[in-house]
Amino acid sequence: SGTPNGQHGNTHEAKLIKLDGDKPNESVSVRKGETVLLNGSRSDVYVDEGGVFGGNATVKSLSVAGVVAPGNSPGKITVLNDFYMNGTGVYKAEILDKDHYDQIVAQSVQLSNGGNSSKLELVYLPGGTIKKGDTFTIINNNGSAPVQGTFNGLPEGAEFAVDGATFKISYVGGDGNDVVLTAQNDSTGPKAPNTGGENVAVNLAGTIVGVASAAILLFMAKRKSFGKK
């Protein structure tokens, strides 16, 4: 399959655009610097380099030169026909556990163009738990044809690690033509980012020590002054 042809519709200029409802005959273009979250259905979706497309959506076709990030952490995008990624495209997939992770469902899947492979960016969500042997079908290819191409640096059977979790990737998983990650070890998701509480505690302790030291010095100075009288 190739890049879908046709007129681009609904060109947006805002930074964040939220689209809801079903408009199956309306296409969407996601421009550089834009994030479009679609919770509903549209026709053809085009994601330019520098654009981000997400939400729980059903679309006729999806062409990605930017970033596709299904769901609202996590979720699913269903593509009724072709899912196409070019060399600058990035699939940002989030995983919480074996029952909660991002997925793209499509009738045909192409992950590279002219030798330039798209990229997989896997995110292990805080609070997640993964057991060895857990499988994650991040692309469910409903068509009969195999996946065309592979993600950059991840050939068939490659292993890679994300936040302590190691995965093996296959492009012939599931019923024979799905992109499936298999966990190679038990792991837990990363801790939530530090909100500054630890730094506050350290700074507060330092302040207390500083105040105490100042008080001691002041007391000793007064004693010396008193002794001279």
Can you say where each PLM-predicted feature lies in the sequence?
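Domain-terminus/edge residues, biased toward the C-terminal soluble/receptor-binding domains
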Residues: 28, 141-142, 170
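C-terminal low-complexity, Ser/Thr- and acidic/Pro-rich disordered "stalk" regions positioned immediately N-terminal
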Residues: 164-200
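Surface-exposed beta-strand/loop patches in extracellular or lumenal glycoproteins
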Residues: 136-140
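Extracellular beta-strand/loop-rich repeat segments of large surface/secreted proteins
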Residues: 14-28, 37-135
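Active-site and glycan-interaction determinants of carbohydrate-active enzymes
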Residues: 145-165
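C-terminal membrane-anchoring or membrane-association module
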Residues: 212-229
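Ser/Thr/Gly/Pro-rich low-complexity, disordered linker/stalk segments of secreted
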Residues: 1-11, 186-195
